């Protein structure tokens, strides 16, 4: 790949990634279900971020997820109940930076026929895990008489599990019905096309 072609590919990836981050951010404003101390069901808002990695690889996926994390902090930041410096650091890292940058790991499955379907449940569950750890480390003060781990599991699961299921279901539909170009995959050449090029 020459320099000009590489530059065009990078520009294309930048534009597409920016549009997908913007789409995810817009979808995150659709909140049919919102919890009192952060967390809400935002249908399919994670899917565009997953698509960045699927279309352009790990580097772009992680970068897109990181930028999306910053936008989420700007949109609605939930300060820790303790108000300590350590609490703020934990919230910023676990509930935002790690939770959303993780979605870019979808880039590990780039080029696979059902890459999105594999990435969707794995990456979204990893986000759930990040919030789960945050619930134990930071938000456990709200657990009252409930075990902290169970409180975090149920609280974060109440919005993350519906999101995981919905995102995975739509990913399955896309993998089955969408053309390869959606996933930045070349359509396999037909037999007669292969024979023509070999002559």
Predicted regions and their residues:
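Hydrophobic transmembrane alpha-helices
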Residues: 1-60
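Residue-level recognition of pore/gate-forming positions within transmembrane alpha-helices
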Residues: 21, 25, 68-69, 124-128
């Amino acid at each position: 790949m020459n320099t000009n072609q590489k530059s065009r590919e990078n520009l294309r990836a930048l534009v597409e990634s920016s549009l997908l981050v913007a789409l995810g951010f817009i979808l995150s404003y659709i909140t049919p279900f919102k919890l009192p101390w952060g967390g809400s069901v935002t249908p399919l808002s994670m899917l565009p971020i997953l698509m960045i990695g699927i279309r352009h690889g790990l580097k772009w996926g992680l970068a897109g997820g990181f930028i999306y994390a910053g936008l989420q902090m700007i949109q609605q930041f939930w300060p820790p109940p303790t108000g300590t410096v350590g609490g703020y650091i934990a919230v910023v890292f676990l509930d935002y930076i790690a939770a959303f940058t993780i979605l870019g790991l979808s880039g590990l499955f780039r080029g696979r026929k059902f890459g999105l379907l594999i990435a969707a449940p794995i990456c979204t569950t990893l986000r759930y895990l990040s919030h789960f750890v945050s619930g134990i480390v930071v938000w456990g003060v709200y657990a009252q008489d409930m075990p902290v781990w169970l409180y975090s599991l149920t609280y974060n699961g109440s919005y993350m599990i519906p999101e995981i299921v919905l995102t995975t279901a739509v990913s399955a539909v896309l993998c089955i019905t969408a053309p390869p170009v959606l996933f930045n995959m070349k359509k396999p050449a037909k037999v007669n096309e292969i024979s023509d090029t070999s002559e």
